Amino acid sequence: MNSFSAERAVSPLDGSELWVVLDPELVPHREASDFLRALHGASRSPHTIRAYAGRVASFLGWCASQGVEWSSVSLASLARFKHFVEATPGRDGRLRSGATVNATLTAVCEFLRFCARTGVIEQAVAGQLSEPRWLRFTPPGFDAGESGQFRRMRARLLKARAETAFPEAFTPDQAGQIMACCQRPRERFMVTLLHDGGLRIGEALGLRRSDLHLLPDSRCVGCTVLGAHVHVRHRANPNGALAKSPFPRTVPASDAVLFSYADYQHERAEILGEDGCDMVFVNLYHEPLGAPMTYRAAKRLFERLARECGFPVRPHMFRHTAATGWVRAGTDLDVVQALLGHVSLASTTVYLHARDADKRRAVEAVAAGRRYR
């Protein structure tokens, strides 16, 4: 296959991370790179942009290897590309899941639609990616409009079969085991913050000290939010961490978060003294000391916890655990939505799934009251 590649670049203006797609001659592919810059300008997550860069590069490479002109690609050719993605093993040697195939096609479709909007390709190329479809049944939280006009959606023709995966959450015993494996105060604070607050790892790594309002009353610093809380804000950070949602939110801080943060602050002061870094999470155990903690460092932490605990430990599982706990405690879905920072309530309803134990109790409760002859 003619190799197109996704490469990381650094903006000479503000030092922010950018992604470009290079052709086999190592020349930036103009349309693909413009698309990625547009995603950056729209404040899309760095992880999303990086993933889209690789998927668009794969599509362009496939087109070049098959003699297909990407700018006038047909629906039949896109179906062939879909089959190629399905049949080609990933880096781990396994075939890609339906969800991964769909994610690849989503990136390609967004790229083609962007090119159509900017006049690079014909509108007909983007128009073939979907078809009119009337939604008879709508998901929870979906606004169909006053006259039902939003029920008429456009369904992608290129879609792989994907199984619905329920969010992975820790049991109370597993959460306790993870905490017991945390060796240092900074580790305990991070795990507690993710577990109790439901923050994404990018949101946690992007926190500034000024975002933590841990007094019962923060009006002295101009904040009217009651009680101890954490502000989650979307902005550029020196460690590349970024909150996914562009909308700011506040998350109440539990007593466990307060106590673990105090322990972490003592540890930080003992190691660094009076450091001037405003980032909450900084390097304490390796050089450069005092520098903002990176995604790579956080990844090493959770990989170590997984090895010691004997089960998968990923940062996002703490978010799933927090959300599942709130829902099962009877918290209204709109409150859970606000805590998680979901734009759509439909994203929150995934936590309404029934456990096997719940289903068994329901069946046995009804069956116990019946009399069979």
Task: Show the residue positions of the predicted features.
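N-terminal core-binding DNA-recognition domain of tyrosine recombinases/integrases
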Residues: A32-H47, A57-F142, Q177
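Active-site/catalytic core of tyrosine-dependent DNA strand-transfer enzymes
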Residues: S254-G310
